[in-house]
Amino acid sequence: KRPDLRVGHGILGEAVSELRGDYVLISQPGPLAHVDPAIPEAAVATVWTDSLDEDHLDALVASVPVADHVVGIGGGMVMDTAKYVAWKRGVRLVLAPSIVSVDASVTNTIALRRDGRVEYEGFVVAEPIVADLTRIASAPARLNRAGVGDLLSIQTGRFDWALGARANTIAFDDRVDAEAERVLEALYEMSADIAAVTDRALEHIIRAYATVNALLLEVGHSGPEEGSEHYFGYAVEAATGRSFVHGELIGLGTVLMSGLQGNGQDR
């Protein structure tokens, strides 16, 4: 089932006003500064998040007020925090990405840090996902461009997936592989718009995220888009103890790993 993904200008306020019941808002000061004040004012509580450490997330789950919905407005950290709280509480979830630097708004599993390492937990569906282009376009252009990294990873992910399939360590699906390749080729065709951070590019990135997520659910694993480039990123963060802009780090990993693979690095 495709998610209820809504894309347009100035649509966030209407989407939140349609909710039946009350809500807890999870965000950060930066993203919330560009949002209609009526949205935080109507929330049962507004909760800031600054970490994906499991202990921090569990503390939020224990402390936030009871509500019918969790609404997340922000970047990848906010998306995963809101997903975690909604999953643990068993309540409905609304996600409104303020940036397209990472695919967290359309994925169902939840990224968290456990003992300093990125792991994935749970399964939750946001209904709806509200991609308000007015809000997203207000984010720094560099960060919106970074979103391409979580899609370019198809270049190296598919290569590694095929290697794994030949070694009988992962299931392969020709149709899903072909669909993933189409997503990648469309991304290259959109490169000028992505560089200019046009509305067309922002919508393309968020819809491509949703398409890829559907493919991963169908095949039952992340092989089509998560390979050595992602593991490079995880290793860098584990070794440095730092977080980086996810799309930029994965983009770097894709460039490096495609060179090692002999797999279209010049693109």
Where do the protein language model's features map onto the residues?
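Short Gly/Thr/Asp-enriched flexible loops that form oxyanion-binding sites at enzyme active sites
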Residues: 78-92
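Short beta-strand/turn micro-motifs composed of small residues
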Residues: 26-27, 74, 131
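ATP/NTP phosphate-donor binding region
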Residues: 1-69
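Gly/Ser-rich catalytic serine loop of serine hydrolases
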Residues: 72-78
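Short glycine-/acidic-enriched loop or helix-start segments at secondary-structure transitions
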Residues: 34-37, 81-83, 105-106, 140-141
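A glycine/threonine-rich phosphate-anchoring loop and its flanking beta-alpha core
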Residues: 88-185
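Active-site segments that bind and position negatively charged phosphate/pyrophosphate groups
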Residues: 175-267
